[in-house]
Amino acid sequence: YVAGEQFGTPVFIKFLNRLGIKPHSNLTIVRNLSALNIQNFDVVVLDSKDSLNITDVDFKEMQAKYPKQSFVILSQGTKSGNFTGSEKWRNLVDTMIYCENLVAYTSGDKNRWGGKGSMRVDAQ
């Protein structure tokens, strides 16, 4: 998990504690990509592409260099509900999942694997 600007902040630590997430052998939390050996992981979460200053070109290079890894890319949103950055990101991802008010949903406009739906995420 590459936490970017949130790494080590009280809000981030509270978030991890609330979810019961603690670093262990299957989870590594770092501030930036340079602190992570990507090839050692099956899944890499980038939170967020905006705070990590990752461009669509950077990501394409990362995908080419690490073809066996899966990436979950978080993007900051605008007040109008769009994600920030280049529209080229839409062509790089398999599924776009929108999250708002503890509800995660796909809109059907970008889901290579079919269907659309929603799920509610309850935070304790």
Functional labels for PLM-detected ranges:
Residues Y1-R31:
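Conserved P-loop
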Residues I13, D56-F59, F83-S86:
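Conserved strand-to-helix beginnings and helix N-cap segments that scaffold or border functional pockets
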Residues S25-L74:
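Phosphate-binding/switch loop-helix module in NTP-utilizing enzymes
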Residues Q63-Q124:
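Phosphate-binding/switch region of NTP-binding enzymes
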Residues Q6-G8, K49-T55, T78-G81:
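Short acidic, S/G/P-rich loop/turn micro-motifs used as interaction or catalytic elements
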Residues Y1-A3, F41, K88:
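Generic secretory/membrane-interface signal
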